[in-house]
Amino acid sequence: MSTVCLSMIVKNETHIIHECLESMWNKIDYWVIVDTGSTDGTQELIKKFFADKGIPGELHERPWVGFGVNRSEALALCDGKADYAWMIDADDKIEGDFRYPNNKNLVADGYALKCGRDQCIWWRNQIFKTGIGWKYTGILHEYANCDKQPIHQEKIEGNYHLEARTLGNRNVNITQVEKYTKDAEMLLQALETDPTNSRYQFYLAQSYFDSQQWDKATEAYYKRVEMGGWEEECYYSLFRVALVAMSQQKDWAIIQQKLLDAYDYRPCRAEPLHIIARSLRMMGRVRAACMFAKQAAQIPHPPQDILFIDTNVYRWMALDEVGSTAFYTHEYQTGYAVCAKLLKENLLPPSEIERVRKNLEAYTQKLQEIEAANRAAQQAQAEAVKLQTPASPTESKSSYIPPRAARFKQRK
């Protein structure tokens, strides 16, 4: 069985680190934590926590240089202490049922974990084989690379995620706009000396987006796309350009075209089509909405993608758009099937169950009305044949329900 050493860099984390350590202590055999200048008692909290748990380890104190340098130093200090090092931020924590593969008999050089925030997931290397030269690169949004080449990397699947909370010391006493404005300034300066660094360019655009500098974000995203390279990052840049246009309340025709640009770039991603479907439905354009919703619902969760995937779109939201619009296109059987699937397979969050149940009832009633009308028509036709007189058409007594009908519920 492989041994695992917890690896962290910390500074003034007493307000948040206990939750992280509680989620990690039963998954490790040793710990090596580097403090970069805490003045709030973080060091004592860490030592007491692990002493109470009976887990050996060591605390080092080092001056702050930068994320890449300090993380690399923390990883190097794990060499010889365990077979693997698990790097985690003080404000992150493991949620769910995490299990090591192969009963903790680890074989890969590195393992990517499923990270999440709100509806979004992404995969990131967090567990590294020690002694083979893993290092972090970058001033912000740093990433791990390895001296050993080629390397064997795997994902650890399962019903868990690493909750990325952005609640650490870097987020204290500062607004999100201020934080990401500072990040943008740092990345812009870094790009002056390394202008071909596509990762810096992408996170410059992200920082502009998160600091609500919309025009700069659009320009930076398009520049990232022009640089080429990783297709997922280019796709997401185009997708965010569309979200910027939505934030700026631009004309729908412009927004829709930008969403279609993102979809055309990476048609295995359903998020752009889902937004189009939902937006059209809210405009009352239910037939067009249903068309886009059905296309989005046909796209499975992309198993090969690792960057910023809205899992709810693939789990239930695209299907729900079909269920919310098929009634108005007279595709009652389709709407019934979708609502039944959402309920039967427990795909919905609790807040949506009653609404979808009412929609299923509306579809059921409509299908029963159609079936009754068909039976009546068939019976009338049979009677007419007996009398050897021409059959007269029978109209359904049910009427078209307009989009604002009270008995059919749409998601807001």
Residue ranges and their predicted role:
Residues E44-E73, L77:
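Conserved donor nucleotide-binding strand/loop of the catalytic core
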Residues G68-L75, A82, W86-I88, D92-E219, ...:
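Catalytic-site signature of metal-activated, phosphate-bearing donor transferases
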Residues Y208, A245-M246, L280, A326, ...:
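Residue at a conserved register position within TPR or TPR-like alpha-solenoid repeats
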